[in-house]
Amino acid sequence: MIVIVGAGISGLAAAYTLSRRGEHALVIERGEPFAEQSVGLARIFRIAHQRPELCRLALHAREGWRRWESEFGAGRLLGSEGFISAGAVDAVAAAMREAGAEFRRLDRGEIAAHLPFVDVPWETGIFDPLGGSLRIRRALTALAQRADIRRADVLSVADDGAVALGDGTQLRAERVLICAGVQTPALFGPLDIEFGSHTRFTYQGADATGAACLSAPEGYGLPIGSTGRWAFGQDVADPATVRRLFPTLTPVGQVDCVTARAPWLDAGGDGWALRRRGRVTGFVGANLMKFGPVLGELLADFVLDAG
C-alpha cells in the first residue's frame, strides 16, 4: 500500500496516476479535500514561464488536462481564454521561444481588447493562446471521486513507512508521499520553504466571461469560468491599485490563499522541491495547479522508484 498525505491537486493527481498503474493508494487528509493550497475556484493555466523547461512541462500538462477531460467526462476543465503576461516580459518571451511555444507580443491597445474592463497601464505584453482559466471544482471533484480518501490527522511518518494517526492507528506503507502543503515540512523535515498568506478577491460589474487571464506587476487575475466574475490576487492587498485597474468592478467575495517563498522558486514564483528519506517522499511547491496531470506522473514515478 502507498500512503499519500494531503488531498490537494498533487496528492489526488498522484493517487489517480498510481491507481491507473494498478497500485493501491490511500490518501490521508486532515480536513476537507482541496482546502488549503488548492482552495478556491480560480486558477490560471499558462504555458508562459520564465524558464524554458517549465514552458515545456506546461505544454505536456496541457495535453494531460485534455486527457483528463476525456477520462473524467466532467465537461471542460481547461478554458480557451488565453493568458496575458503584462509589463516586463522579455524573460518570458525568451523562455517560450526556446521551448517552441506559440506567443505574440501585444501593445497597450491589444491588451485592452482582451481585457475591456481594465484601465490598462502597461505598454507591452505577450499573449499565450494556449493559456486559460481552469475549472478547478470539476477537476478536483472528479479526482476525489476516484481516490480512496481517509479523514485523519497524521502525527508522524517514519523512514520505514510507519504512519501514526491521531486516533492511535498505525499504518504500514510500502511507500509514503507527503504533499500536505504547509504541513509537509513538519512531517517530512526541512525543505527550505516558507509559507504565508494572501487574499484573492472576486469582483463583478462587467462581464469577464471570455476575458484573458492576466499576470502583471500589480497582481494576477482571471475570469471565474462562465460566471462573469473576475478574480484578482496580490501578495499585499492594495485597494487603490485595484480601483485604478478595474474602475467599474465591485468586490463581492474573497478567498484566503496560501503562498510560498523559497530560494529554489524562479522569479515568477514557480517551481517545486522533491526529496526522499527512506521510504518517504516529501513534496512542496508553488503555483502547482496548472501542472496537475504532469505532477501526477512525476510523483508516481518518484514514489515507485526504489533507487
Where are these regions (language model features)?
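Short loop/edge segments at beta-strand edges and connector loops
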Residues: D107-R108, R150-D153, G253-D256
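Beta1/beta-strand and adjacent pyrophosphate-binding region of the FAD-binding site
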Residues: M1-S10
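Helical element adjacent to the flavin cofactor pocket in flavoenzyme catalytic cores
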Residues: I126-G161, L165-D167, L171-R175, C179
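Flavin-dependent oxidoreductases
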Residues: R46, E63, R172-T241, L245-V252
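C-terminal catalytic lobe of FAD-dependent flavoproteins
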Residues: T248-G307
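Dinucleotide-binding Rossmann-like beta1-alpha1 core, especially the glycine-rich loop
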Residues: A42-H114, W122-E123, E218-Y220
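Conserved Rossmann-like nucleotide-cofactor binding loop
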Residues: S10, P33, Q183
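Glycine-rich FAD pyrophosphate-binding loop
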Residues: S19-S38
